[in-house]
Amino acid sequence: MDKLIITGGPRLDGEIRISGAKNAALPILAATLLADGPVTVGNLPHLHDITTMIELFGRMGIEPVIDEKLAVEIDPRTIKTLVAPYELVKTMRASILVLGPMVARFGEAEVALPGGCAIGSRPVDLHIRGLEAMGAKIEVEGGYIKAKAPEGGLRGAHFFFDTVSVTGTENIMMAAALAKGRSVLQNAAREPEVVDLANFINAMGGKVQGAGTDTITIDGVERLASATYRVMPDRIETGTYLVAAAVTGGRVKVKDTDPTILEAVLEKLKEAGADITTGEDWIELDMHGKRPKAVNLRTAPYPAFPTDMQAQFISLNAIAEGTGAVIETIFENRFMHVYEMHRMGAQIQVEGNTAIVTGVKALKGAPVMATDLRASASLVLSALVAEGDTLIDRIYHIDRGYECIEEKLQMLGAKIRRVPG
């Protein structure tokens, strides 16, 4: 199992390109199943979860064609089996996203109950209830969700999400794209990745309106056609590299990104003392060698502060001037990285869903273990400013969400290398 060794100290300085967003790419790949012709999706990040989704299509009899720039062409007409097997689904929760498209396009689906990150309870009941509202018959047995559309196909429905669910919104929106009549999704997720998926469905000829608000209206169409689409940039990767610059007192310009989808994070970085300038597709952060100031923050659904940036800001607060409170309202069990950071000398007290972080002047390198995707990013950030070497184990978590993290950090001047386990 690979490990990362990071020697702390250097201020980051330079420019990097941001990858496509995994959390947009996965639902968009799932939505290709809705088309009745070949679809090409570009700007895919080179990540394990993307490879798993493409492998899942291969298992279903679809043969994706991948070019050298990692754009993939998928022709769902060649599908041979409507089963998403456990051995693939268990490694990636996003596999549940094929459920809605398969039931809508092919009339049935069998999808294993998902695995993935070990944070909190992420029930799939909203996906099931949404499809049932559209007339699907669903049974959960033997660890599989077995769904069948009614005769004549899914019917449009009004559905209220009693908790905001990004993947739930995406799954039901995809199913509704081919349902008969109008569907209205209320208390829908507003994330930019949901908007990107809606734009993709519309690029194939769908009729989705209101994505980015809490009410999405979908008028079902008879067929969705071939299309070519480019996935949006990854706002969490963008934010992570900006925080990396902030903790090291450095200067970083991130390119091929979108500052408008990161406003809550940019505000907090300004509060921490960063100078930030933006263009249409770039953001530059400069700390001018200063130590950041501690910030208070509370995670909440978009457009508020994203839960996927919480761990990175705990790393920032850990070496900042002052004390900051970080309140996590989205997932339980999302402070697992705190106990690893204690090994590096961080002063963090967890009380329920709040972490009180008192900044110290210096962290100390130590052997630590990644526990989930974003927590592992926070350990990398802490290691960049720690005295001495930090060895990070279980970095397959990092590889699930960050494309070429060590190469990109090396380009900015970090002392980081990957060693085989």
From Swiss-Prot:
It is found in: Cytoplasm. UDP-N-acetyl-alpha-D-glucosamine binds at residues 93, 122-126, 308, 330. Signal peptide: none annotated. GO terms for cellular component: cytoplasm. It catalyses: phosphoenolpyruvate + UDP-N-acetyl-alpha-D-glucosamine = UDP-N-acetyl-3-O-(1-carboxyvinyl)-alpha-D-glucosamine + phosphate. Phosphoenolpyruvate binds at residues 22-23. Pfam families: EPSP_synthase. GO terms for biological process: cell division; cell wall organization; peptidoglycan biosynthetic process; regulation of cell shape; UDP-N-acetylgalactosamine biosynthetic process. The active site is at residue 117. InterPro entries: Enolpyruvate_Tfrase_dom, Enolpyruvate_Tfrase_sf, MurA_subfamily, RNA3'P_cycl/enolpyr_Trfase_a/b, UDP_GlcNAc_COvinyl_MurA. The modification 2-(S-cysteinyl)pyruvic acid O-phosphothioketal is found at residue 117. Pathway: Cell wall biogenesis; peptidoglycan biosynthesis. It comes from the Bacteria. Keywords: Cell cycle, Cell division, Cell shape, Cell wall biogenesis/degradation, Cytoplasm, Peptidoglycan synthesis, Pyruvate, Transferase. It is an enzyme of class 2 (transferase). GO terms for molecular function: UDP-N-acetylglucosamine 1-carboxyvinyltransferase activity. Its EC number is 2.5.1.7. PANTHER family: UDP-N-ACETYLGLUCOSAMINE 1-CARBOXYVINYLTRANSFERASE. Cell wall formation. Adds enolpyruvyl to UDP-N-acetylglucosamine. Belongs to the EPSP synthase family. MurA subfamily. This is UDP-N-acetylglucosamine 1-carboxyvinyltransferase. It comes from Pseudomonas entomophila (strain L48). The lineage of its organism: Bacteria, Pseudomonadati, Pseudomonadota, Gammaproteobacteria, Pseudomonadales. The gene is murA.
